[in-house]
Amino acid sequence: MFKALAGIVLALVATLAHAERIRDLTSVQGVRENSLIGYGLVVGLDGTGDQTTQTPFTTQTLNNMLSQLGITVPTGTNMQLKNVAAVMVTASYPPFARQGQTIDVVVSSMGNAKSLRGGTLLMTPLKGVDSQVYALAQGNILVGGAGASAGGSSVQVNQLNGGRITNGAIIERELPTQFGAGNTINLQLNDEDFTMAQQITDAINRARGYGSATALDARTVQVRVPSGNSSQVRFLADIQNMEVNVTPQDAKVVINSRTGSVVMNREVTLDSCAVAQGNLSVTVNRQLNVNQPNTPFGGGQTVVTPQTQIDLRQSGGSLQSVRSSANLNSVVRALNALGATPMDLMSILQSMQSAGCLRAKLEII
């Protein structure tokens, strides 16, 4: 009897948990990307560059670049340029990058250029937080947007003032690394979880011997590794491919107050409750009335007077019952039955949590 009951419990736990690799749950502390930034010029634009009279830094940058190339611009010259734009260039320096390796860069206009399509980024040094140059960027910009204008009307799809250069920067300086120098490596969990940290520790200790791993906190697992780069690479390769049984995650509902989107995971459940939601709408109409004098030579003036009309309407919401829901599909059907908009749904979920009917953490971003 006891064995049968234990078998049922183990089968139930197996259905609730699923296995994931340690590499999908953690990252190695210190193995990360670093941000690079630079300021440069984009040339070759088809009349869509900066208006140099309004962006003097573009002209100043161009003069400095020409002087470095041995070209002197007479003092006081007013250059009316339309095919040059000042831009900021950003990139991510990957871990273990070597000299001569290429990385992608993102180019963004910082002036009043209309479009960077068809432009070429001139050689731009990319610096780190220590003001040292780590890469040089140059190349043709690929812009994903499109636009056209004529007769005062314009149409634009996506962003025209930003683009990307694939393999547009060459690494010139390598970052020092401490990998392979010590006898311990810290694995950082993607999300803080005491249970997951202990499960990863137990999995490593079962495979590598007791004491090989220690959970320092809810996010960090310290692993004892052999010395030397090649030995640590092999050791980490074996550890990262180990599988850990992942227990059900915390029930959570994430609400984006700016876009009105609501996202929930499959652990969210509802208790029975009743919801009444009223709709309040405010309409503001503003018109400009032009009053002109009746006599053209009477000395009167034309006056523009605004006329504003505000209309307030409120429709009563009926009391609707929400049944208890034990899975995500039932929760979705129950919320859809209310007929609420995403903006109304945000306030409904907050009220449900306050009333104790929403069994989940509510996070507003």
From Swiss-Prot:
GO terms for cellular component: bacterial-type flagellum basal body, distal rod, P ring; outer membrane-bounded periplasmic space. GO terms for molecular function: structural molecule activity. InterPro entries: Flag_FlgI (IPR001782). Keywords: Bacterial flagellum, Periplasm, Signal. It comes from the Bacteria. Residues 1-19 form the signal peptide. Pfam families: FlgI. It is found in: Periplasm; Bacterial flagellum basal body. One of its GO terms (biological process) is bacterial-type flagellum-dependent cell motility. Its main location: periplasm. The basal body constitutes a major portion of the flagellar organelle and consists of four rings (L,P,S, and M) mounted on a central rod. Belongs to the FlgI family. Assembles around the rod to form the L-ring and probably protects the motor/basal body from shearing forces during rotation. NCBIfam families: PRK05303.1 (NF003676). This is Flagellar P-ring protein. It comes from Salmonella typhimurium (strain LT2 / SGSC1412 / ATCC 700720).
